[in-house]
Amino acid sequence: MRLLIGGLCMVFAVSAAGAQDAVALKRGEALLAKECSRCHATARTDESRHPQAPLFRTLAKRYPIESLEEALGEGLISGHPDMPEFKFEGDDVGAIIAYLKSIQER
């Protein structure tokens, strides 16, 4: 009986973690769509509207995705004149990183 209850607790914990991950992915997707999609391709299949804006699904070919965490939290500044500065808050940074990891081309 203890084994059954322990197993059920583990299943519920994994389900809750999966639900939180799904919420974070949706939040990251929404943030990037709102803040970045006027120039960048922020999804798995769209194209960038600005010719010099990289596709977000290919960022891992240029940088380790985790390396963007600090820049997103402290303020993202680009030398490109059309790119505005962005600074995201803690949970938003995590959601963006999770979403970016989920869409990378393999």
Model region roles, listed by residue range:
Residues 17-22, 45-50, 54-59:
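His/Cys-centered metal/cofactor-coordination and adjacent catalytic loops
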Residues 28, 33-42, 96:
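The canonical Cys-X-X-Cys-His
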Residues 105-106:
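Short, solvent-exposed mixed-charge patches
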